[in-house]
Amino acid sequence: MNIVIVGGGTAGWLSALSLSKNHKITIIDSSIPTVGVGESTTDRLVEWLLRQGIDLQEYIKEVNGAIKLATYHVNFSKKEYCHPFNIRDDQEFLDVSTWAYTNNQPVAPLSNFYNLVVNKQVPNSLEGVAIHWQAGLVPQYLEKLLKNKITIIKQQVSNVKRNGNNIKSVVLDNGQEITADYFVDCTGFHKVLVGNDDFESWNDKGVVDSAVVWNEPFKEFCPYTILEAKEYGWCWTIHTKDRAGRGYVFDSSYINPDQARQEIGVPDARTIKFDVGVQKNIMKGNIVAIGLSAHFVEPMEATNIEFTITELDLLDKVFASSMTVDEFNAELYKSAHEIRTFLKLHYIDNPNSNTEFWTNQKNAKWFDKTYQKLIVENDFDYIKQNNWQWYDVFSWLCIVQGLDIKPKHSIDDPALLAKYQLMSI
């Protein structure tokens, strides 16, 4: 199959890596520089890269990568708390996690990585870890890796020729016309191919929509992403091999970029405006949106790259006729909403700030059903009943307990107590 990818960046080159295994790929990369701050990922990316045949040690070296084991939350609650990755996800582990929370025992120490996080160490194995990397280096490395396997065109698309929901061809700045069986839109918030007609905006859902970003010199190694609540949003710190990528994510309906820069004391921080939401139909006709053109929500738990690789895995199924386009779209639409709900949990209550932003976040009505089930009723079976795939009970409980939300009942089970004592050593 002949597939054209429009747009480079992380999404474009990850798409080229995945799709080039079974298809003829042309990537149209305008070579417009990326913002170049640090990017954070989740533990599922490492397993995905291995499936693509990537040498992880080489990859980490080439992208100035560093190991990530957790997210570490500061000023979201009375105390700092940790949401670590964990290798185990079987039902016994999840039952023990629930027992721990309902009996006021720490949940996070059940993770294989908890003690490493506390001591700022990394495991001997790469199993279950994630990576911090320098964003601009990923396309460079993958281009070098794929240059003899795919066609690379350094141009911009000036026109798109359509036939209903399908694209017949794209026309480049130099007048060249490119045809294909399928077109993949990796143009980010520009959405050059997919447009905005089918885009479900979440700007009315109390989501942060802007950021100011900057880099700082390397100070110390931290195997986790630091998230620090601020007056009108939160800051990230992502440690790569030789520097720290920083960003202040905020809601532009409360403050503007200059006010954000003033709050953090970085007058030259660059501004990014997010297009927050999801395409209702990520695949339509012979067009597929991958990456930011398909979906974006604030990068608090580093879900955006994971969403990209999930899209690519499901797209493989569509092309192999083991999944329909309708199933593809429905699963990704549901996933985007699940991610948004999980991130909303982080905003339930911040005792350290009483700004209008935090007050409105706490009172956001669209979260009511999940709040009722998880926080009021402690019905953690609700996660399983809804077939939520992105975050298991352990992750939800790390956030709920970290926010100092007390359990409403306890589980009396000596067997689970014994298992907890073994797992939390």
Located regions from the model:
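Beta1/beta-strand and adjacent pyrophosphate-binding region of the FAD-binding site
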Residues: M1-G9
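N-terminal Rossmann-fold NAD(P) dinucleotide-binding loop
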Residues: G12-W13
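Dinucleotide-binding Rossmann-like beta1-alpha1 core, especially the glycine-rich loop
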Residues: V37-N119
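Long, low-complexity C-terminal extensions of enzymes
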Residues: I67, A320-I425
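Predominantly flavin-linked oxidoreductase catalytic cores and closely associated redox partners
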Residues: E127-A260
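Conserved FAD/dinucleotide-binding core of flavoprotein oxidoreductases
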Residues: A229-V276, H295-E306, V318-S321
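Short FAD-binding loop at a beta-strand-to-alpha-helix junction that anchors the flavin cofactor
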Residues: M283-M300
